[in-house]
Amino acid sequence: YEVGAAMAPYSSVSRLFRRHPSIRWSRPYHSMIDDSVRTLLDAEPQWRIADCSEPAILHDGYRPELLAGSDKADRLRQAMEADLQERPGDPYASAKLGGLLISEGKNEDAIPLLENGLKQCGSAGAERYELLLHLGLALTPSDPDKAVNCYRQALEIPLDTRVSLGARLNLAARLMDQGNL
């Protein structure tokens, strides 16, 4: 659970794991172990992934008072821009940088970045959900109907209900604005 997070209070992250020499951190800035776990499961299929039904970690690094005056946004921007230089259109980096741009009010910069990330993203999964959620947020001021479509597509992805809370709440808000709820 992301205490104080403005956009999505729940995230599904792989942070609790059994010690194994093949599991390592990857990706810039928002480190994760998912890539190495996929490789490990291919090589050693006897391993199983456990899913916590309740939030296992309370993270408070996104509270506004903690972010104010920090260089967290600059570090995120630099890491994601460098990653996109190496892998243009990478869905993970596009989603993270797109979210940052939206939080800074740069929706017009975020939209093409997120659309490009979606073109290179598979048909399911957390990255696609995050791209669609952020694209919906970016489109809301200029094209609320298109934003509604993004939220609906995001909700078609089979994710834990808590993880999809952002799309659910934003879809409900847009439908209320349109008088359709």
Language-model regions, residue ranges each:
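Alpha-helical positions within canonical tetratricopeptide repeat
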Residues: 109, 146-149
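Start-of-helix register in tetratricopeptide repeats
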Residues: 92, 126-130, 163-166
